[in-house]
């Protein structure tokens, strides 16, 4: 079913997984039993870990948290080109409320820790259960002291019982525990790492 959805999203009925690791990560995301750290190389298909669940599970909210404005721009362009419906949370749009008819919700990491976002998320969860939160370029959180103050309280993201999915192409093995701690991931978090060889 996920592979069929991949073909529809890519407009290629013969589409296949980029790598076995992408397939493994996708299966873990779709099972939704544990948190997932997907450490796949650039071009390894990380974006599909947010897109496929949103396309397959229209009655579930999928949050995509982005730590950089440039990532927001890239994702908006990519989703528009793929004709994937999405909404972007902004406190001054739609009265700060989220729409229940569009299940893929993009939010900047700095806004995702504000009270207005927490209220909007709690409200939408009553009509569109939020089941997954995907955080792109999760390794940036480890650089937060030098990077952006707003990322220092990133563990506050999981205000609802939901699966956390961290995407990155740049997490050295020695940084995995620090990243798990920063996001307060469950001890049984699935780690899918694509070899850099």
Residue ranges of model-derived segments:
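Walker A/P-loop
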Residues: 32-52, 165-171
């Amino acid at each position: 079913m996920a592979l069929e959805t991949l073909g529809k999203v890519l407009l290629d009925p013969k589409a296949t997984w980029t790598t076995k690791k992408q397939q493994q990560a996708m299966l873990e995301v779709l099972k939704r039993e544990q948190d997932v750290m997907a450490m796949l190389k650039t071009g390894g298909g990380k974006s599909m870990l947010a897109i496929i669940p949103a396309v397959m599970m229209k009655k579930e909210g999928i949050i995509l948290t982005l730590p950089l404005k440039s990532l927001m721009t890239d994702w908006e362009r990519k989703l528009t080109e793929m004709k994937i419906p999405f909404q972007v949370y902004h406190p001054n749009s739609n009265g700060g409320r989220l729409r229940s008819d569009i299940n893929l919700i993009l939010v900047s990491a700095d806004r995702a820790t504000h009270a207005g976002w927490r209220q909007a998320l709690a409200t939408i969860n009553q009509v569109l259960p939020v089941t997954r939160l995907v955080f792109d370029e999760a390794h940036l959180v480890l650089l937060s002291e030098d990077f952006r103050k707003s990322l220092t309280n990133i563990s506050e993201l999981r205000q609802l019982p939901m699966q956390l999915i961290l995407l990155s192409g740049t997490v050295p093995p020695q940084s995995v525990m620090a990243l798990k701690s920063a996001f307060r991931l469950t001890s049984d978090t699935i780690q899918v790492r694509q070899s850099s060889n």
